[in-house]
């Protein structure tokens, strides 16, 4: 299934039906009074969270969405039928904005949550409502009011506890495939991952959702490399795993420079992103060059006024993954129990479900 995380749609609520001008036509009552019924109310446009959905693909090609109009009133005091509501189902994590102003209208995260995003018009009153002692035969009725309409932008922000960030080809997809049952595309070239992947990781007697965020590059906060689309999905994450490639980065790159560059992009996009707890890990330490680079980064960050722990991990051998998951779990659940496994041992694949 294609992953679509932003769409623009037009919604139109139903118009209210017009009230009727009608008269009583009964035997032996030659001049019956007014009997025009009211028009029905127009249907609302409603957004509803469907936990079975994970993308906005349904709205990519169908942009116009209109609820039913209310029916007109009729004679014999008969009111028109209300128009049916139009229910648009969206995945959890959908943010709705007014396309014209950019104002955020709602943030939909709970299964079954419903929001009326465009209110239907009110049905007009029939002429029977306007009869009075001075006007016993009103020849007019009220028109229904038009339903609300607006252009909307729907943005999907993934609901994940942990986001894995880093440069392209830093090993994010390999890591998530090792610690969960997610099976992203993995290849030895940058930007293999073009859409976020989700996996559920079992940790002790708990679990948490991890998102593999496609690789970030310098300028991501300004949209470079689809940066806006990718960074959006980090906003809801409570903890970030910051992967740094230890082996053979491109010319001119080094682990410390990569770490600083990605952190600068997070800060430029949002102050909130910059403040999120981070677990730093150097990847591919099964390669001697990467292990040496990781040890060097450990020393550099360890000398800071507030030392930053650096994990050395290999998704290939499993080395360091137990300790990494413990650090993530403690950051999420505020637990401080020490890791009991021996350092450097291979990881038995954690019990997890995608």
UniProtKB/Swiss-Prot annotation:
Keywords: Cytoplasm, GTP-binding, Hydrolase, Magnesium, Metal-binding, Nucleotide-binding. Gene3D superfamilies: GTP1/OBG domain (2.70.210.12), P-loop containing nucleotide triphosphate hydrolases (3.40.50.300). Residues 1-159 form the Obg domain. Pfam families: GTP1_OBG, MMR_HSR1. GO terms for cellular component: cytoplasm. Disulfide bonds: none annotated. GO terms for biological process: ribosome biogenesis. Its main location: cytoplasm. The keyword Hydrolase applies. Mg(2+) binds at residues 173, 193. GTP binds at residues 166-173, 191-195, 212-215, 283-286, 314-316. It is found in: Cytoplasm. It comes from the Bacteria. Its cofactor is Mg(2+). Residues 160-333 form the OBG-type G domain. Its EC number is 3.6.5.-. One of its GO terms (molecular function) is magnesium ion binding. Monomer. Belongs to the TRAFAC class OBG-HflX-like GTPase superfamily. OBG GTPase family. An essential GTPase which binds GTP, GDP and possibly (p)ppGpp with moderate affinity, with high nucleotide exchange rates and a fairly low GTP hydrolysis rate. Plays a role in control of the cell cycle, stress response, ribosome biogenesis and in those bacteria that undergo differentiation, in morphogenesis control. This is GTPase Obg. It comes from Anaeromyxobacter dehalogenans (strain 2CP-C). The gene is obg.
């Amino acid at each position: 299934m294609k992953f679509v995380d932003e769409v623009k749609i037009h919604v139109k609520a139903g118009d209210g039906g017009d009230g009727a001008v009608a008269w009583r036509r009964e035997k032996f009552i030659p001049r019956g009074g007014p009997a025009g019924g009211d028009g029905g109310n127009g249907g609302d446009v409603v957004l509803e969270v469907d936990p079975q959905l994970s993308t906005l693909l349904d709205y990519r090609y169908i942009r116009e969405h209109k609820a039913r109009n209310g029916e007109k009133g009729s004679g014999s005091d008969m009111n028109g039928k209300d128009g049916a509501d139009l229910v648009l189902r969206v995945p959890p994590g959908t943010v709705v904005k007014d396309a014209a102003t950019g104002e955020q209208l709602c943030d939909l995260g709970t299964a079954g949550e419903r929001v009326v995003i465009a209110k239907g018009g009110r049905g007009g009153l029939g002429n029977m409502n306007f009869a009075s002692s001075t006007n016993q035969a009103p020849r007019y009725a009220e028109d229904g009011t038009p339903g609300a309409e607006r252009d909307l932008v729907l943005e999907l922000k993934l609901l994940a506890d942990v986001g894995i960030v880093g440069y392209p080809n830093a090993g994010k997809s390999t890591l998530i495939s090792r610690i969960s049952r997610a099976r992203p595309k993995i290849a030895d070239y940058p930007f293999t991952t073009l859409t976020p992947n989700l996996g559920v990781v079992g940790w002790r007697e708990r679990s948490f959702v991890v998102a593999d965020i496609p690789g970030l590059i310098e300028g991501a906060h300004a949209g470079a490399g689809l940066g806006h689309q990718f960074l959006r999905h980090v906003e809801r994450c409570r903890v970030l795993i910051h992967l740094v490639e230890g082996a053979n980065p491109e010319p001119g790159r080094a682990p410390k420079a990569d770490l600083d560059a990605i952190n600068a992009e997070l800060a430029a996009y949002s102050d909130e992103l910059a403040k999120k707890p981070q677990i730093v890990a150097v990847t591919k330490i099964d390669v001697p060059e990467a292990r040496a680079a990781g040890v060097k980064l450990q020393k550099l960050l360890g000398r800071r006024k507030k030392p930053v722990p650096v994990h050395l991990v290999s998704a290939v051998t499993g080395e360091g993954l137990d300790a990494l998951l413990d650090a993530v779990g403690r950051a999420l659940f505020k637990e401080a129990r020490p890791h009991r496994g021996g350092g450097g041992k291979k990881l038995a694949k954690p019990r997890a479900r995608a």
